[in-house]
């Protein structure tokens, strides 16, 4: 009887125990946003906040192309525990929308987080950038590129392409520099010197070819140099120079001029004068020349690519009794007694330092100007070759000097020395008006040429070699007078100190003497010829 009672009590106990036991709930969790989405992968995860009353067995992610994915779909799992976790979803298809949920399991139940959707990246051509161009030479350069993304497909070809057009393609010049993504270097060859090229990196996958941004560069070349005109002509020297207008892309290590009596001189075949480095203008002196000789000169400039030359300039050194002005007008000279004179009238448009003398053709401006000025007789350039130019008083007294270096405007006293050397009576030297007719002083100074002088050109013998010509003059009243009849030349001596009245000399076609201006001289507003006297 007691045994039956005990069994009954045990059964009741078990019945009570089982009737009191509660089934566990599913775990509680959330799904993280999807990040780092690529062509075939993405990152997500979850956060298990409640185990549902039973230990977490596993947790992970499930995903599908259909909504509300379950553990029966694609999953990734890891050991279960409370807390946050992250997983990488793999094996995805590009350009596809997926639905993903975090899940966790306990002993009896599966819990799911909220659903999150995302779309994988669509496959594309690669992404490529062009590297800077370096090691530029005359026929080659280096570049390359970087492929940060293959577009989801293997890169099967990469390199750079180049041309003179702004958007070169692989159909033109190109390099082939391997496969795959990452960085690469490329050597560009077969280029033409001094040419601007455009280069682009390229990368190709099964979808096509993409290009980086075009980068331009210019290949190196010899410098570009011009030759200056020749100036400062003398019997054994001259001045030239040039300008390096482009370095060719490389440092100019030498520049100057080279010259020879043969055409197209070089730094190897001729004589050279080196004048510095770099770009810009330069001046070169040529010395040791032979008088009365034809020379050829070229400017040169050298960089690492080579030596370039400017155009050839031809010049002649002066004969023994010649001098040149700053404009390269050449004058013959003559010794008369103790003096050396020009045999021609001055033609220069510049002072001896190179500054311009104004060409003034307005009568009012000529009268009012306080600066040096010149003009042709009758403002007609046809008179220049035979008669030279007419200058005002301000020009002949300017400190910059109208005569070439080593020469000057003769003073009244120096004109008297010339006249005395030709036999003028000493008493006449101080007289004004025409003097020295008895000694034919004027005739000895006049050129014997009735095409230049009006007949009879009285007394003309030119036995001195002075070769005076009648270039006429410009009057204070604004008129030109005396072409072919009167030659009028300035002296540097004021007729009255501290005034604008100056002495001058005149030869006339009908008089054998030479005229010295009256004591009141000539108002400085006149325009006369100039003969230069050696210092």
Regions found by a protein language model. Give the residues of each.
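Bacterial Sec-dependent N-terminal signal peptides
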Residues: 1-27, 318
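Compositionally biased, low-complexity segments enriched in small residues
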Residues: 1-5, 73, 93, 192, ...
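Short, surface-exposed linear motifs at loops/turns and structural transition points
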Residues: 20-319
